[in-house]
């Protein structure tokens, strides 16, 4: 749960389709690798595969959204809460944008959409919560905002170097 500066409480659910998205990406990159001798680091998905990949990523996003909505509905029902409005914020995705009757694609890796007036959710961490903001629609920033504060240590390193009891101590009083 998070609270804004006006006292409004928000239920925040941070999930995605990380594994499904990785499988989707790997499948299409492997297919692209079959089509030429370009080194993997320089590979890109093109032509018919690009269109299929775009639709596959949309399916991953729909899966992630459905997952969040199911979690939210379960919590809201059990707690007898009215969870409106819902701000659904994606990150790490490909989208088609239309500005002034022109269409273009934006790949957002570590970023979320921040169109003019759009509600923006920027997760900081489990302890400090999220930033709720409003998009500025800045063309120089690809109509985007950062998604999170970034990770300074890989998850695997955290698991190796920290304990659950340390985590509980840091998170004491955080609900």
What are these regions (language model features)?
Residues 2-175:
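Domain-length cofactor-binding catalytic modules of enzymes
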């Amino acid at each position: 749960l998070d609270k804004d500066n006006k006292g409004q409480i928000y239920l925040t659910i941070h999930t995605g389709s990380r594994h499904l998205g990785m499988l989707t990406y790997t499948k299409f990159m492997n297919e692209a690798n079959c089509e030429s001798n370009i080194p993997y680091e320089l590979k890109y998905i093109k032509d018919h595969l690009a269109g299929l990949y775009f639709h596959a990523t949309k399916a991953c996003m729909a899966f992630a959204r459905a997952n969040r909505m199911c979690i939210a509905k379960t919590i809201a029902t059990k707690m007898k809460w009215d969870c409106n409005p819902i701000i659904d914020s994606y990150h790490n995705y490909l989208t088609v944008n239309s500005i002034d009757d022109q269409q273009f694609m934006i790949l957002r890796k570590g970023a979320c959409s921040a169109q003019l007036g759009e509600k923006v959710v920027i997760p900081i961490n489990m302890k400090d919560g999220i930033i709720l903001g409003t998009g500025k629609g800045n063309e120089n920033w690809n109509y985007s905002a950062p998604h999170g504060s970034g990770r300074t240590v890989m998850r695997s390193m955290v698991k190796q170097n920290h304990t659950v009891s340390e985590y509980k101590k840091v998170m004491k009083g955080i609900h």
